[in-house]
């Protein structure tokens, strides 16, 4: 029974949940028992999210390898830079187009925001070095991020078996989170019913503005910011490669909503481009963790929308801190449907916003997630391919071998590109030495 339920598209189930929740919220707003579904769903997310974030970040950091003879270093720089620039763009857009959400009962459980810079820094440092076990129990995401980075760095020195155990633990908790997310349609029924019964249709319409802002920012980043990065690295017209990656990788990712499912597609596309197999065989799978520009946009915009709703003044310092925090914390979630939403409580804690308020915003995220998460996954997955190719072309340019990107893309479309394998790379090096 459950297997048949899981086989049904999550998008379809969420759409049905939205329709049912909206109808019940308008027709029978007095049926408060329906709200329990939303409370159960949010409660389950609150329980699993801290452990999920901890293991994902720790696992991703532990896998980093240095000294390998490939374009890996350039790819990592591009991945991290793209995630940071995406977060900065999201913060800038949030300042230009501030949005307020309607959160039922928000003012009753809001915490006071920190006032001065000294208080903010002291609070951040104190929270970051809290006991890691207590942090997992209490949902202290700053401490979770701090300890996962440190432990992940330490794990780089351990054996492959140890790293495999950590990876399998992360995969196990991810599977649990995925099972929880499978019940999102029921949670959405409860959340939407509660929102409509307490705030009316006008309050829910504000979610449409939030969705438009999220999607517009992601489109801007992929079609303006990322191409500019490609041009800086290659000094070639970036748009043939940009649009090609959207077509071959972004469109499938939009419908599957899973970066992990899209990895084979990206590997084949890299082969079609004639990229170095030794490089893309590592960078494409890692991109699911290290390259999370779409997730950083979601976290930044939804966190600032929450701050605006609560009347929290966001200083330039806190905004910049949010950019870095969103970029770092987004590492590891782009392979999970709806994973970026689980990072909102951590980012919201910067502004003294309670976990209860943040989880209400997570609920809103699942309501708009049919479109938001699809676009986010498309941006993340397509940019894995975009930056893997860019890194190799940039390194070739530095070595005095500029690449005709348009010709490469055209050849890839026809399947006539020359594939660069590790063996061919070694042969080329031997020829140069002779």
From Swiss-Prot:
A Pfam family matched in the record = SDF
For this protein, the parts annotated as crossing the membrane are 14-34, 41-61, 72-92, 135-155, 172-192, 210-230, 282-302, 316-336, 351-371
Where is this protein found?
Cell membrane
GO:BP terms for this protein? serine transport; threonine transport
Q: How does it sit in the membrane?
A: Multi-pass membrane protein
- Region (Disordered) location: 413-434
**Does the record's keyword annotation contain Amino-acid biosynthesis?**
no
Report the catalytic activity. L-serine(in) + Na(+)(in) = L-serine(out) + Na(+)(out); L-threonine(in) + Na(+)(in) = L-threonine(out) + Na(+)(out)
Cellular-component GO terms for this entry: plasma membrane
Q: Which HAMAP family match?
A: Ser_Thr_transp_SstT
Q: Which family does it belong to?
A: Belongs to the dicarboxylate/amino acid:cation symporter (DAACS) (TC 2.A.23) family.
State the function annotated in the UniProt record: Involved in the import of serine and threonine into the cell, with the concomitant import of sodium (symport system).
Q: What is this protein called?
A: Serine/threonine transporter SstT
Supply the source organism for this entry. Answer: Lacticaseibacillus casei (strain BL23) (Lactobacillus casei)
